[in-house]
Amino acid sequence: MNILLTTLISLVMTYEMPKLPYANNGLEPVISQATIDYHYGKHLQTYVNNLNSLVPSTEFEGKTVEEIVASAPDGAIFNNAGQVLNHTLYFLQFTPKPNKHEPSGKLAEAINRDFGSFENFKKEFNAASTGLFGSGWAWLSVDKNGKLHITKEANGSNPVRAGLTPLLGFDVWEHAYYLDYQNKRAD
């Protein structure tokens, strides 16, 4: 492949920061503007920049973040792609000042079917989140048969690697909560 075509492909397939659907202070008082500025503006931006510098001229050039996460071996490309995917899903899942605090419709039905109740789901999800040693993510995902699963993923891993579709992610890396909650992960 010639250099011009390679350059054009890399320009087209650059990974970008997601646009937040809320203001940086829109999640207060639960998540402060300082945390959003730091977590979104510094951490996620660094993962995006790293991924854009690592992928060109590799077998992953031209692939989506999901494809990279599903197929890349452990290492720098996987770690940065995983964190871009995880953080993108994380930041886009929030709604400032929601008027409902419980799921409804098909999601509520699936939670009741697979966990017995929303309360049971919350207990299991919180246990996964607080029980993960070190850094990582807790996820609610769905498999190809529609069954819900709670998983704990170390570091930058994602349920996509196991063929699951993530629905809800909770970042338990300290940078996600330390400015607001210090060492109180369970809060």
Question: Model-flagged regions — what are they?
Answer:
Residues 9-187:
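Feature for soluble, non-membrane regions of globular proteins
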Residues 1-7:
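Sec-dependent signal peptide recognition
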